[in-house]
Amino acid sequence: MGKLALAAKITHVPSMYLSELPGKNHGCRQGAIDGHKEISKRCREMGVDTIIVFDTHWLVNSAYHINCADHFEGVYTSNELPHFIRDMTYNYEGNPELGQLIADEALKLGVRAKAHNIPSLKLEYGSVVPMRYMNEDKRFKVVSISAFCTVHDFADSRKLGERIVKAIEQYDGTVAVLASGSLSHRFIDDQRAEEGMNSYTREFDRQMDERVVKLWREGQFKEFCNMLPEYADYCYGEGNMHDTVMLLGMLGWDKYDGKVWSLSPSYSQASWHRSG
């Protein structure tokens, strides 16, 4: 019987890559990078063999899609922010078995999920960025699930999360799951882009994000789940926050009562532990 060892809501802010490079932004996202490396450390300590990523940069207009190729390899340049991420190489093993189990389980609840083992279907940066800092040595297999869902209902995303747990139970291994996406996600007007590098676009969003992280730390998931649809709407949650809905679906929704660790306060990077 498989085990879900760790679940986390993480950032994939592209300036993490800039933070590595010489220049004025060197070191600007070290806290976020350190948070990713701490999650990797905990996964290793728990014996995780596969990481599932809910990727809010994988936009889909029909169905839920699971990228579970045998192998992922490529050179990634962001088509929306090529001045942030350019020529980033990646090379990871996939897990077709687990991906297919997820699709099969989701279909049992009428969720239109499709597993793909297609060499030309590449990873998006919601997966590539965290794997850069968590999986440099290819310790973990990778499965990426679309989470920028344009015409999808929260109820289906929640069901998908529930069925992922069932799939993991059938899998002979230990799995971690990452909801890769921002909380509030309103981009600043282009002429003000430089001033927004290290600040929120709106004070309202900052206040809301801080409140949300406080709710998580205090275990107030009933309150958070009740506000989630409006929060995702009013604060422009990344991918409409389907990644977070999937994550909470896995963990029992508003009944989750496990531990929560906050690893990177600036980016609300939280690790939610569930043993089983």
Curated annotation (Swiss-Prot):
The keyword DNA-binding does not apply. Keywords: Aromatic hydrocarbons catabolism, Dioxygenase, Iron, Oxidoreductase. It comes from the Bacteria. Transmembrane segments: none annotated. One of its GO terms (molecular function) is ferrous iron binding. InterPro entries: HPCD (IPR011984), Xdiol_dOase_suB (IPR004183). Its cofactor is Fe cation. Pathway: Aromatic compound metabolism; 4-hydroxyphenylacetate degradation; pyruvate and succinate semialdehyde from 4-hydroxyphenylacetate: step 2/7. Its EC number is 1.13.11.15. Pfam families: LigB. Disulfide bonds: none annotated. Gene3D superfamilies: LigB-like. NCBIfam families: HpaD_Fe. This is 3,4-dihydroxyphenylacetate 2,3-dioxygenase. It comes from Escherichia coli. The gene is hpcB.
